[in-house]
From Swiss-Prot:
This is Bifunctional purine biosynthesis protein PurH. The keyword Hydrolase applies. Residues 1-148 form the MGS-like domain. Pathway: Purine metabolism; IMP biosynthesis via de novo pathway; 5-formamido-1-(5-phospho-D-ribosyl)imidazole-4-carboxamide from 5-amino-1-(5-phospho-D-ribosyl)imidazole-4-carboxamide (10-formyl THF route): step 1/1; Purine metabolism; IMP biosynthesis via de novo pathway; IMP from 5-formamido-1-(5-phospho-D-ribosyl)imidazole-4-carboxamide: step 1/1. Belongs to the PurH family. The keyword Disulfide bond does not apply. One of its GO terms (molecular function) is phosphoribosylaminoimidazolecarboxamide formyltransferase activity. The lineage of its organism: Bacteria, Pseudomonadati, Pseudomonadota, Gammaproteobacteria, Alteromonadales. Pfam families: AICARFT_IMPCHas, MGS. SMART domains: AICARFT_IMPCHas, MGS. Keywords: Hydrolase, Multifunctional enzyme, Purine biosynthesis, Transferase. NCBIfam families: PRK00881.1, purH. It comes from Shewanella pealeana (strain ATCC 700345 / ANG-SQ1). GO terms for cellular component: cytosol.
Amino acid sequence: MNNARPIRRALLSVSDKTGILEFAQALHAQGVELLSTGGTARLLADNGVPVIEVSDYTGHPEIMDGRVKTLHPKVHGGILARRGIDEIVMEQNNIKPIDLVAVNLYPFAATVAQEGCTLADAIENIDIGGPTMVRSTAKNHKDTTIIVNAKDYGRVIAEMQSNEASTTLETRFDLAIAAFEHTAAYDGMIANYFGTKVPAHSNDECHEDSKFPRTYNTQLVKKQDLRYGENSHQTAAFYVDTNLDEASVATAVQLQGKALSYNNIADTDSALECVKEFDEPACVIVKHANPCGVAIGENLLEAYNRAFQTDPTSAFGGIIAFNGELDAATASAIVERQFVEVIIAPKVSQAARDVIAAKANVRLLECGEWAAKTTSLDYKRVNGGLLLQDRDQGMVGLDDVKVVSKRQPTAEEMKDLMFCWKVAKFVKSNAIVYAKNSMTIGVGAGQMSRVYSAKVAGIKAADEGLEVQNSVMASDAFFPFRDGIDAAAEAGISCIIQPGGSIRDEEIIAAADEHGMAMVFTGMRHFRH
């Protein structure tokens, strides 16, 4: 094979020692001479693997507390040398070819994530020699093999064993791409860190100036190509942030069903993030990124039955999310009752999987349990730019709200208000949600005027024969006029939760009092666009 390049000499220098001993042993078994540095060299030597210290190879010791180890012509000349072109120069300078380099970099991200990390700590974990070797080897991938991820050790050894201790150009090119991606992400993390800091009087300290750096660097990895985008004439792919490990649609495992579409992924994200808001067994049904039915119950089956009852028409072809293990009874209720695109839960029992298997096209996802909410950022793409903000994780409890009406909400009303407020956060603005007994009974989403969202919620409830009388209403933002209050009262709403903050708040409160309603202010808005 004319593009195969034999591996006769390798340089191994890794911070993450996972699998490196076994890799080195396999290379040695193939007759490869091994060069190494520091802790990696000690690990190999202690386990009987013949290894040459890089400082012995170059004839130059490590200096400056290890800051300078591999930055030497005998190292980089051996890596960058073009086979068939540079042999005379190599011979004149006593440089031997280095055919494979396995490097992973100082753990900068893990270091700066630690509480109490100083600027000095961060600086000492900026790798210099490692990225230089990675880039050199990747640049010369025509002749040299680079490995930056332990998962590729086995791949390279297998190819060498079947290919006379050589690697193919296809493999080297693929590994070079991974290497450039690796160094780009690494430098991006460093730039992001320093871009949010300003120096203090001490060289060892710095202060956070902003969570938004001057340039924002992130790396997303393609998880899958999609059949098409939001519409069939658009092409699309799904990219994920591999630095985040929270339960999400990005990290979920698909257990069965057709390939996820662009819209499936977007809607599943909306459903899952909404159901995470609840501690009790809960079900969220989403259609076109809006919850069309949300409920909590004694168990998931009851929660699903009640969520479906809100709007069976819209639930057809919807996305269903749960916050507990999906059981067979709930799975049976779903497949017997409706057409569903996606079901997602933190865990799916084997019995539930067996039930859903009868519907081969249903996409079944398992996302794992979730813990505390993350501090990651939210993105919105605009033409020519990107909007970044904190994720909307604002919460209010019973102690945070203020009753502004003459009538106090009852305990049951207050419970429903808290439930309704959580749902409204995930409905497109202008958002109005009607709820009763911890179940949505009408959702008005995305109307350009708030009063029309209130009317839509009432129409939805009436269409499904749901009793609005003495139910509660949540509004994601303040009411600019009293017409929304009047519409709610006409529908039978007894209690309202809203942020407050309108210049007409007094008029709005007076309208609530006029109708005998209770009204609660949260002081927090939940626009969703």
